[in-house]
UniProtKB/Swiss-Prot annotation:
Function: Catalyzes the conversion of long-chain fatty acids to their active form acyl-CoAs for both synthesis of cellular lipids, and degradation via beta-oxidation. ACSL5 may sensitize epithelial cells to apoptosis specifically triggered by the death ligand TRAIL at the villus tip of the crypt-villus axis of the small intestine. May have a role in the survival of glioma cells. May activate fatty acids from exogenous sources for the synthesis of triacylglycerol destined for intracellular storage. It was suggested that it may also stimulate fatty acid oxidation.
Induction statement: Expression decreases in response to fast and increases after high sucrose diet.
Misc. comment: 5 rat isozymes encoded by different genes have been described. ACSL6 corresponds to isozyme 2 (ACS2).
Name this polypeptide is given: Long-chain-fatty-acid--CoA ligase 5
Organism: Rattus norvegicus
An example molecular function term from Gene Ontology annotations: long-chain fatty acid-CoA ligase activity
Keyword Ligase: yes
Membrane topology: Single-pass type III membrane protein
Reaction catalyzed: a long-chain fatty acid + ATP + CoA = a long-chain fatty acyl-CoA + AMP + diphosphate; (5Z,8Z,11Z,14Z)-eicosatetraenoate + ATP + CoA = (5Z,8Z,11Z,14Z)-eicosatetraenoyl-CoA + AMP + diphosphate; 15-hydroxy-(5Z,8Z,11Z,13E)-eicosatetraenoate + ATP + CoA = 15-hydroxy-(5Z,8Z,11Z,13E)-eicosatetraenoyl-CoA + AMP + diphosphate; 12-hydroxy-(5Z,8Z,10E,14Z)-eicosatetraenoate + ATP + CoA = 12-hydroxy-(5Z,8Z,10E,14Z)-eicosatetraenoyl-CoA + AMP + diphosphate
Any single GO CC term annotated in Swiss-Prot or TrEMBL for this entry: membrane
Gene from which the chain derives: Acsl5
Stated family: Belongs to the ATP-dependent AMP-binding enzyme family.
EC number: 6.2.1.3, 6.2.1.15
Topological domain ranges for the Cytoplasmic compartment: 33-683
Residues the record lists as N6-acetyllysine modifications: 361
Length: 683
């Protein structure tokens, strides 16, 4: 006892006392700085709630009242921007840069003033502040695009984006369909194309072209000869300043934009979206983020997704409503990493195609067994933290493994949202582990403005698209031909709410095909309610066909499964009603193919590998293996493939501006190879 008493109460030696104090301080600092988990806000086993008529709403929504707006002073896109001007205290708004230079910024007031001057110019030229006044915007993402769009909203006009790569014939169709008499475009090359169409009497209604970039007198004279007035954007703004008109803002129910969706077949369809459609979708997004992420004037996003995407425009609207900043990429996707490092965005909207490239590059750089082991261990360890609600980027694994990836995206991303196409489980899991920020997957289409569902904070499982957002309900309807029935929690995804469009411009027949008498939008996608109340996309109603034996084929579903194959960049699955099997066209990934081929003992250039029969056989076997793992039936598996070295792209006419396959064009482009594949198998 005496020994214990002496040990406890005798003075400690100075070194021991210092060690004890140091240890105690370290424990105290760890306790107050340890990462705090963010707990789920809803029951993750019951993420959506059934309502009358078989529809469902998100569980975070307290009742069946659908949201119309988030801020009472921002019910139109004009008011959204004015709110941003106020809350930012006229802070920086739109940023741009030249190669190897920092971003330069235009303030909110400068943007607002320039929009008013441009709009005043249009009124001075005789254009009306009317719902029937459609203004074409034909440009790549840049500050002037936003200024032109805001000019429309400031004077109750309607913006009609003419997508950069919509195609010459589609541009003519849209201009005529929407009776567009004025187009604001970026380059002399586009202006020349517009003038040529007028010279050929293909777009007789076009009267004015306003050009963002400098142009010469020859172009102006050429325009004058065919009745086109050519104006520089600078001159148009000066003219509007001299003949200023007070803003004539729209009402929430007024049209804001006609977004022509470039279909995979047929002519583009003009989806009519109101200010209320877009603002309600923005409001639902802000409501969803409210408990975990509140955008501020300090937030910045990068604009690189085509402004053909309503997804991109929705994110921009959210940023504007909170006074944040938008920086534009230089126009070359290859320079995007450099732009990201210079801009350091905090909000990053993205698409699986880009994330797949980053993921594949990281995987390919882990060449040795030790590097692969460390990478996989880092992913598992970090993702375990994420599953426990810990979102951070200051862990040991961040310093050792993930800091380079984070830095390549600017190093300050707080929020990532992926949409426009399905994302694979490994890729989504990787980014949730690697980025140390909130990463969500959203689902929607232009006809419901942008998004109708999104994954929930705290649910870090993959393979689904979350639950309905608070501006719409979702239900599943029977598709008997494909054996999908709502009683089995399967069917066509239908959406009803404040974000659902008003129909297609001058096309009541197409409108009735997708918008029923009760206001439900029929998406053409097949979904399944999972036991936890989340929505999973399982099939596609459109673009289906029958094989000779009567089996229905949904090629997009098969392509989504095959996209998980490591050596694959793109795949096109083709079938015909007089054939009993499928064939495919495969574009390998240039970064993954060499290592894939090396495993079977084949080396060579990318083009040589694409022509090698052993490589072709190995790719086909890998596709069939991935297909079997993905649950494809035997008749859904391709029997042969053609390996093509050049990617499908917007430029070669094989993808739409929203990066969807143009199936008719692909079949025409590869008709010789398709015929050869069928003949070789039938022999």
């Amino acid at each position: 006892m005496l020994f214990i008493f002496n040990f406890l109460f005798s003075p400690l030696p100075t070194p021991a006392l210092i060690c004890l104090l140091t240890f105690g301080t370290a424990i105290f600092l760890w306790l107050i700085n340890r990462p705090q988990p963010v707990l789920p806000l809803i029951d993750l086993d019951n993420q959506s709630v059934g309502i009358e008529g078989g529809a469902r709403r998100g569980a975070f929504q307290k009742n069946n009242d659908l949201i119309l707006y988030y801020f009472s002073d921002a019910k139109t896109l004009y008011e959204v921007f004015q709110r941003g001007l106020a809350v930012s205290d006229n802070g920086p708004c739109l940023g741009y840069r030249k190669p190897n230079q920092p971003y330069k910024w235009i303030s909110y007031k400068q943007v607002s003033d320039r929009a008013e001057y441009l709009g005043s110019c249009l009124l001075h030229k005789g254009y009306k502040p009317s719902q029937d006044q459609f203004i074409g915007i034909f440009a790549q993402n840049r500050p002037e695009w936003v200024i032109s769009e805001l000019a429309c909203y400031t004077y109750s006009m309607v913006a009609v984006p003419l997508y950069d790569t919509l195609g010459a014939e589609a541009i003519i169709y849209v201009i005529n369909r929407a009776d567009i008499s004025v187009v604001i475009c970026d380059t002399p090359q586009k202006a020349t194309m517009l003038i040529e169409n007028v010279e050929k009497d293909l777009t007789p209604g076009l009267k004015t072209v306003i050009l963002m970039d400098p142009f010469d007198d020859d172009l102006m004279k050429r325009g004058e000869k065919c009745g086109i007035e050519m104006l520089s954007l600078h001159d148009a703004e000066n003219l509007g300043k001299e003949n200023f008109k007070k803003p004539m803002p729209p009402n929430p129910e007024d049209l804001s934009v006609i977004c022509f969706t470039s279909g995979t077949t047929g002519d583009p369809k003009g989806a009519m979206l109101t200010h209320q459609n877009i603002v309600s979708n923005m409001a639902a997004f802000l409501k969803f983020l409210e408990p975990i992420f509140q955008p501020t004037p300090e937030d910045v996003t990068i604009s690189y997704l085509p402004l053909a995407h309503m997804f991109e425009r929705l994110v921009q609207g959210v940023i504007f409503s909170c006074g944040g900043k938008i920086g534009f990429f230089q126009g070359d996707i290859r320079l995007l990493p450099d732009d990201m490092k210079a801009l350091k965005p905090t909000v990053f909207p993205t698409v699986p195609r880009l994330l797949n490239r980053v993921y594949d590059k990281v995987q390919n750089e882990a060449k040795t067994p030790l590097k692969k082991f460390l990478l996989n261990l880092a992913i598992i360890s970090k993702f375990n933290e994420v599953r426990n609600g810990i979102i951070r980027r200051n862990s040991l694994w961040d310093k050792l493994v993930f800091s380079k990836i984070q830095s390549s995206l600017g190093g300050k991303v707080r929020l990532m949202i992926t949409g426009a196409a399905p994302i694979s489980t490994p890729v989504l899991t990787f980014f949730r582990a690697a980025m140390g920020c909130w990463v969500f997957e959203a689902y929607g289409q232009t006809e419901c403005t942008a998004g109708c569902s999104i994954t929930s904070p705290g649910d870090w499982t993959a393979g689904h698209v979350g639950t309905p957002v608070s501006c719409n309900f979702v239900k599943l309807e029977d598709v008997a031909d494909m054996n999908y029935f709502s009683v089995n929690n399967e069917g066509e995804i239908c959406i009803k709410g404040n974000n659902v469009f008003k129909g297609y411009l001058k096309d009541p027949e197409k409108t009735q095909e997708v918008l029923d008498k009760d206001g439900w939008l029929h998406t053409g996608d097949i979904g399944r309610w999972l036991p936890n109340g989340t929505l999973k996309i399982i099939d596609r109603k459109k673009n289906i066909f029958k094989l000779a034996q009567g089996e229905y084929i949904a090629p997009e579903k098969i392509e989504n499964v095959y996209s998980r194959s490591r050596p694959i960049l793109q795949v096109f699955v083709h079938g015909e009603s007089l054939r009993s099997f499928l064939i495919g066209v495969v574009v390998p990934d240039p970064e993954s193919l060499p290592s894939f081929a090396a495993k079977i003992g084949v080396k060579g250039s990318f083009e040589e590998l694409c022509q090698n029969q052993c490589v072709k056989k190995a790719i086909l076997e890998d596709l069939q293996k991935v297909g079997k793992e993905g649950g494809l039936k035997s008749f859904e598996q391709v029997k042969s493939i053609f390996v093509h070295p050049e990617p499908f792209s917007i430029e070669n006419g094989l993808l739409t501006p929203t990066l969807k396959a143009k199936r008719v064009e692909l079949a025409k482009f590869f008709q010789t190879q398709i015929k050869s594949l069928y003949e070789s198998i039938e022999e």
